[in-house]
Amino acid sequence: MKVAKWYNNHDIRIEDVPKTQPGRNEILVKIISCGICGSDIVEWYRLPRAPLIPGHEIGDVVLETGESVSDYKPGDRVFVAPKVPCLNCYYCTKGNHPVCSEVADRLPGGFAEYVLVPDSIVTNGTYLLPDSITYDQSTFIEPLACVVRAQKLAGIREGQTVLIIGCGMSGLLHVKLAKSKNCKLITTDINPRKLVYADRFGSDITVDAGENVPEILLARNGRKADVVILCA
């Protein structure tokens, strides 16, 4: 099968690798869509593990199942989590699952024709997609989950003023989610084009990051923000 293997940000190669057959508790999925996360292009984070196949925001369909898999069948449209926390380590017991110190299985990268899903992720990290969600839309499930968790930790509530610094994909998801909670949204970025999108997504006030943001915030909102979310 074909994969896009990352060696560094200036060296990505299309290579052939064997297509692995699923074990008794595993499934093989065919990748239909795969998003590009900001972390996929952060070299200092990726280089120690290079070369690697990136991509953890995927929409896929089940191609083959192991003989002991009963919850999924070929043809099922699924979302597969990139990793599953152990639920038992110090961090997991404190609710900090993203920094689990005992993660054993990670999803192989989605920049490939097929991905073999290990048994732990089949059991605890694979979800059927409703017909209303397209494969492209399903690539937003993982980043949206990060946004939901962040706003839960921040305790964002209706009526609060929320300042979002950075209007890339994550920042715009924060805008949509906070707007659904009837919050007042102020967004800032160094890129004017991103501020246009923030405005379209529902930001009440957009400010160029090169300006005096605190001063503008006080002048236009009458007070400082209740919550600041950093996405830059």
Question: What residues fall within each predicted segment?
Answer:
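Short Gly/Pro-enriched turn/cap motifs at secondary-structure boundaries
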Residues: 7, 18-19, 50-55, 103-109, ...
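Glycine-rich beta-strand-centered segment in the early N-terminal region that forms part
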Residues: 20-34, 45-90, 130-132
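Short, well-ordered coil/turn residues at beta-beta hairpins
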Residues: 33, 81, 209, 231-232
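Cytochrome P450 core scaffold surrounding the K-helix E-X-X-R motif
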Residues: 39-43
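NAD(P)H dinucleotide-binding glycine-rich loop of Rossmann-like/cofactor-binding domains
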Residues: 86-165
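Mid-domain Rossmann-like dinucleotide-binding core that forms the NAD(H)/NADP(H) cofactor-binding site
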Residues: 134-211
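Short amphipathic alpha-helix with an adjacent loop that forms part of the alpha/beta core around
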Residues: 212-223
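Short SAM/SAH-binding signature in class I
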Residues: 225-229
